[in-house]
């Protein structure tokens, strides 16, 4: 949710939920530190406010790390509230929200799963049975070095290796 007008944003999101519901579809609400829904707590509160059965929370591992979501917080969320997990790793360092790296890393400098400083295992093991995982790993430098196809292959390879090593 990017608009500063929360009422407008809520009404528009509710309209999308209602339209999607007509077709049996669900929507995912992603929290992003530099948006108007910056964290898990805010996303869940927004979902409660909208009271739509077809909206779920999307957990992006980079964003969750940056807003210091704990494994305990994830474990406390009912399984049916999770819709999607965006997988990537990233630097352990958490920049201030107005620092260029806050947006820069998110949009073009994410790291391969298991190759950064995020406690991915702690996070992923505490999200009860998410229906979907998706690798979201924009990294301009890796694409320039490896090419798009090899970058995509490496994204999948590192995720599979990480999941096997951590029994996820």
What do the predicted segments below correspond to?
Residues 1-2, 27-29, 55-59, 82-87, ...:
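Hydrophobic faces of well-ordered beta-strands that scaffold small-molecule active sites
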Residues 4-5, 32, 62, 111-112, ...:
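A generic structural signal for short
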